[in-house]
């Protein structure tokens, strides 16, 4: 194991257990990169020393941009303390529309403290307590997804304006030559992480391609009257084909799509997710069909 993280809730509400966790990690995996997520309030010098001795390599603080100035100042003091003991000190926080000037000022403060970097999160409309967000005038980003699916990991939907502000902040950091790293984590990135966890290492037949771009399993499909001509051409090139008698289509590996450029047929790219129904049962669920043009298709683009 190369990486491990402890998050919450607030892990430092249970300091002995938190430091014990990292000690155990260090004992079993001496070279592991161990990370702690915290809001910062419970961190004191003794705890920071204990975390250092337990092998903690990175600490990430959460700062609420709408907190009172005195509370933010307190967290900044905790960050300054952490810099004395923990090799990598980061901040991770959502980008709330309308907070641009406050965020720019915070970036400058963090840079002055020598913080290694900040992870800007796309702000999300929660799947619960939506009324409180509506009251603040937040609206959904449209479209909410590039590919519609039951994304459970992120627990929300992207809020309009958050991504635009995040990119503005990245540009601000560049233009002002800030030394801290600035990373943007979109909701789409979290969705891709979920799909990757569901799909990677899952055995599938040779008609599927695991996309390194978005982690979907992808295959090509041809329907109806086009099947005969396409199947004959694929047979000449020894391309494996799967038949669906029920839905009247064939599917094959996307790398063969470019072979069909001379045929007057319509080809679709099928995007799929593995759903694990139990320890022994799984299902391949198609979540989107995309029309593709064989003459311009490239496997590297998907």
Pin down the residues of each PLM region.
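Conserved C-terminal portion of the radical SAM core fold
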Residues: 74-161, 167-193
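Short acidic, gly/pro-rich beta-turn/loop elements at beta-sheet edges
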Residues: 46, 71, 101, 128-130, ...
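Surface-exposed amphipathic alpha-helices with a cationic face
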Residues: 19-30, 52, 79-84, 170-175
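Structural recognition of alpha->loop->beta junctions
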Residues: 48-65, 107-120, 201-218
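Radical SAM enzyme core and accessory elements
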Residues: 199, 204-302
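Conserved mixed alpha/beta catalytic, RNA-binding, or beta-rich assembly cores of soluble enzyme
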Residues: 1-4, 128, 185-209
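Core AdoMet radical
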Residues: 1-14, 28-43, 54-75, 88-97, ...
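Distinct, well-ordered alpha-helical segments
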Residues: 15-23, 44-51, 71-75, 103-106, ...
